[in-house]
């Protein structure tokens, strides 16, 4: 998911009929189809979909799958959004239950929960098993904002935050926005450009895109 930390190990694309472009961004390598094809990306050994900003070369959605778009949320924030064919309350319920975060994860890093409260409120803490670069670890996050059916946000021990927002466009369509927010993670880290220099900002952007594309496609498949 883009829910905690993303470090995709590789990305593979099945070409169907368009020109393929190769590239590299930090630790992330990709192959992009310019128009009209479905991209199949492998994130940490799991097949997921990847979408990009409309109007630029990239992997495009197929059928009813919505395009993941870049959101300008300001400095120190990596944000993407997608429209999902589901009610806002249903999508909120998934994110507001940490036990279901593995369902959302497009990065392959989320493993499961160690300790989760029965219901999240501001100040709640939940612990999660993770795996990155083949190494297992655990983190404890704290809920920093919660508004039923509209917003869930939690802070990571390093100081950055993950935020999910749900905008109801109709009873069956929701714009979902996920943001990796590190602008207030600390003066030292920000001064050293820690998240940019380590590649975390770029890898988390890729993980968010994979997660949102996966979520959108799951509901698009359900309607097919």
Curated annotation (Swiss-Prot):
InterPro entries: Polyketide_cyclase/dehydratase, START-like_dom_sf. One of its GO terms (cellular component) is peptidoglycan-based cell wall. SUPFAM superfamilies: Bet v1-like (SSF55961). It holds the Pfam family Polyketide_cyc2. This is Uncharacterized protein Rv0088.
